[in-house]
Swiss-Prot record:
Keywords from the named record: Disulfide bond, FAD, Flavoprotein, Growth factor, Mitochondrion, Oxidoreductase
Residues annotated as domain ERV/ALR sulfhydryl oxidase: 88-188
Chief location: mitochondrion
Keyword Cell inner membrane: no
Keyword Disulfide bond: yes
Localization: Mitochondrion intermembrane space; Mitochondrion
GO CC terms: cytosol; mitochondrial intermembrane space; mitochondrion
Name of the protein described by the UniProt record: FAD-linked sulfhydryl oxidase ALR
Cystine pairings recorded for this chain: C135-C138, C164-C181
Species of the source: Mus musculus
PANTHER family reported in the protein's UniProt record: ALR/ERV, FAD-LINKED SULFHYDRYL OXIDASE ALR
C-alpha cells in the first residue's frame, strides 16, 4: 500500500499533472529529456544533473510554452537536436504578439457607435479574456491594469485608444518602445499610408 503522501498505483518518483482537457503530463525526477521536453531515457550516474529551472519551468515536467519565453526555455536545454516546427505550441512571446494582434484587430473593427449591449459585451469579453489567458503571470498583470483602468468601449476610436495605451503600459514594463497610438487605424485597419500593405 502506498504511503499517504504518494499517489497509489504510480511508481515512486513519478507524479501526474492533469492538464486542461483531461490530458496528463507525467513528472519524474529521474528522466533525461530531449530538446522538446520528451522523456528520452532514465538518468544514470554518467548523466549530468540539470541546472536550476527558471520561473515557469520545473525539472522533470514539460514546460508550459505559454508561460515561458523561448530564450529561458532554451537555456534549460543542454543541446537542441531538432528544429522547431511552425505547428508547435506558442511560447510566451509568440502568444503575446498574436494576442495583441488579435485584440488590436478586434478593436479596429469594433462598431463606430456600438449599442449599449455591444459596449457591455466587449467590456465583459476583455474581463473574461483576462481570466482565461494561458500565461497566468501575464493574465494577472492585465487583470490588475484593467482593474485600475476599465475598458472604454463607448466608441471604436475610444476602445482602440484604450487598448493601445494598455499595450504601451505593458511594453514599458517589458522595456519595449511605445507605439504611436495616433497610428492604430493605419496599423490595424487601413494599412500604412505609403501603400505598402495594398
Amino acid at each position: 500500500m502506498a504511503a499517504p503522501s504518494e499517489p497509489a498505483g504510480f511508481p515512486r518518483g513519478s507524479r501526474f499533472s492533469f492538464l486542461p482537457g483531461g490530458a496528463r503530463s507525467e513528472m519524474t525526477d529521474d528522466l533525461v529529456t530531449d530538446a522538446r521536453g520528451r522523456g528520452a531515457r532514465h538518468r544514470d550516474d554518467t548523466t549530468p544533473a540539470a541546472a536550476p529551472a527558471p520561473q515557469g519551468l520545473e525539472h522533470g515536467k514539460r514546460p508550459c510554452r505559454a508561460c515561458v519565453d523561448f530564450k529561458s526555455w532554451m537555456r534549460t536545454q543542454q543541446k537542441r537536436d531538432i528544429k522547431f516546427r511552425e505547428d508547435c505550441p506558442q511560447d510566451r512571446e509568440e502568444l503575446g504578439r498574436h494576442t495583441w494582434a488579435f485584440l488590436h484587430t478586434l478593436a479596429a473593427y469594433y462598431p463606430d457607435r456600438p449599442t449599449p449591449e455591444q459596449q457591455q459585451d466587449m467590456a465583459q469579453f476583455i474581463h473574461i479574456f483576462s481570466k482565461f489567458y494561458p500565461c497566468e503571470e501575464c493574465a494577472e498583470d492585465i487583470r490588475k491594469r484593467i482593474g485600475r483602468n476599465q475598458p472604454d468601449t463607448s466608441t471604436r476610436v475610444s476602445f482602440s485608444q484604450w487598448l493601445c495605451r494598455l499595450h504601451n503600459e505593458v511594453n514599458r514594463k517589458l522595456g519595449k518602445p511605445d507605439f504611436d497610438c495616433s497610428r492604430v487605424d493605419e496599423r490595424w485597419r487601413d494599412g500604412w499610408k505609403d501603400g505598402s500593405c495594398d
